[in-house]
């Protein structure tokens, strides 16, 4: 094992400068340009006026590793890393980040060092180096860099490891694109069969959403509660999912006692994002199937429980995900947009014949089966979702992939 500080030296501090009033400033990368895949999003790079001299070494070069020094949250620790592959000597990085540059590229392949740090972050390895002050998560960067160790293997093996991981990433991206196309196919099929639910050009019979079911706001928790551990569906679990059928994988919360029945999710419940600082998330919905696993939902969510057999869950869920219905759900909060039961009560849902809804449900099942086939094809091709690369010890565990 080799100390990271021997490989890169101390992390260089970033620059922020002043507002760019001329439009001729220097592009500066921020943590908002970080992605969770370890690559840089160049779409929203700001420019800043940097007047400080002697910062030539801070201009980024291919193979540089940028580490997050400040940010994160209770759920996602600080310490993310991204790999720089942009133009040399063009970009700087801001003061919430640091630069790690391999000193001897002939001994240490920069991408290998990056993958080691990336995998360590995914394992939660930076959490013990966090310093929390007034809600802000700071990385004790010098301590982390001086103590973190990278597995030593020869250069040929380093390159081989990275080639395999890069290939895996390409396949993952290809699979994501295929899944997105399948999702678009579901949307197109829905419109073909039922039309736009707000315009209702097919003139289906309609019913108010709350005439067909009931709503319940989620639970508010207290950090000092203890005694009962229970899985909890929160806003961060929605992502772009339509269905969550393994609630055992959700995070848990501590409560003083088991929630009452009305706060426990049941199969076929639909849960909405009720409130969030990101307006784009408000109104998102998922159908949940907890089975026998006791599962509650957070106070930032609303649970809808269908009580009318006039609609099926696959059909209703797709109605609620259409752009026109999402616009109807848009609240009017100032900083935090809100969805409430009154807004949901004003939603008018077309009710096509149940036979047609069942046809759509069968179509969705076939699409879901195709998604599973993509999953197993990737396994057959030698790229399972759980990938271990071994040297003397396990150095990388991409369990999220």
Could you tell me what each predicted segment is?
Residues 2, 90-98, 126, 130-156, ...:
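A short glycine-rich beta-alpha junction/loop motif
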Residues 84-85, 129-134, 287-289, 329-333:
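Short amphipathic beta-strand starts and helix->beta connectors
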């Amino acid at each position: 094992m080799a100390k990271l500080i021997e490989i890169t030296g101390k992390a260089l501090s970033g620059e922020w400068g002043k507002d760019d009033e001329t439009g001729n400033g220097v592009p500066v990368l921020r943590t908002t340009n970080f992605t969770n895949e370890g690559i840089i999003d160049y779409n929203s790079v700001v420019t800043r006026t940097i007047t400080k001299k002697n910062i030539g070494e801070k201009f980024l070069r291919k193979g540089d590793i940028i580490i997050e020094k400040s940010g994160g949250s209770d759920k996602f620790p600080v310490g993310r890393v991204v790999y720089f592959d942009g133009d040399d000597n063009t970009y700087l990085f801001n003061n919430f980040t640091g630069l790690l540059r391999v000193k001897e590229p002939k001994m240490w392949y920069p991408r290998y060092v990056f993958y080691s740090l990336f995998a360590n972050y995914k394992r939660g390895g930076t959490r013990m180096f966090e310093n929390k002050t007034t809600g802000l998560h700071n990385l004790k960067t010098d301590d982390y860099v001086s103590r973190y160790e990278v597995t030593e293997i020869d250069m040929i093996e380093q390159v081989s490891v990275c080639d395999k991981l890069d290939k895996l990433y390409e396949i993952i991206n290809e699979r994501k694109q295929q899944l997105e196309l399948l999702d678009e196919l579901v949307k197109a099929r829905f419109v073909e069969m039922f039309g736009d639910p707000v315009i209702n050009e097919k003139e289906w019979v309609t019913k108010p959403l709350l005439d067909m079911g009931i709503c319940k706001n989620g639970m508010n928790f207290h950090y000092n509660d203890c005694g009962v551990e229970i899985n909890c569906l929160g806003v961060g679990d929605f992502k772009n999912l339509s269905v969550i059928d393994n609630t055992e994988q959700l995070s848990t919360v501590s409560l003083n006692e088991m929630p009452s029945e009305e706060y426990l999710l049941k199969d076929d419940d639909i849960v909405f994002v009720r409130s969030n600082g990101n307006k784009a998330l408000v109104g998102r919905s998922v159908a949940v199937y907890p089975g026998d696993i006791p599962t509650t939902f957070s106070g930032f969510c609303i649970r809808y429980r269908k009580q009318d057999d006039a609609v099926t869950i696959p059909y209703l869920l797709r109605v609620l995900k259409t752009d026109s219905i999402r616009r109807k759900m848009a609240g009017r909060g100032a900083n935090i947009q809100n969805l409430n039961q009154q807004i949901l009560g004003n939603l008018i849902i077309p009710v096509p014949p149940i036979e047609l809804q069942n046809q759509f449900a069968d179509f969705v099942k076939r699409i879901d089966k195709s998604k599973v086939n993509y999953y197993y094809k990737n396994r057959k091709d030698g790229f399972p979702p759980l990938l271990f690369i071994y040297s003397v010890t396990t150095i990388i565990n991409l369990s999220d992939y």
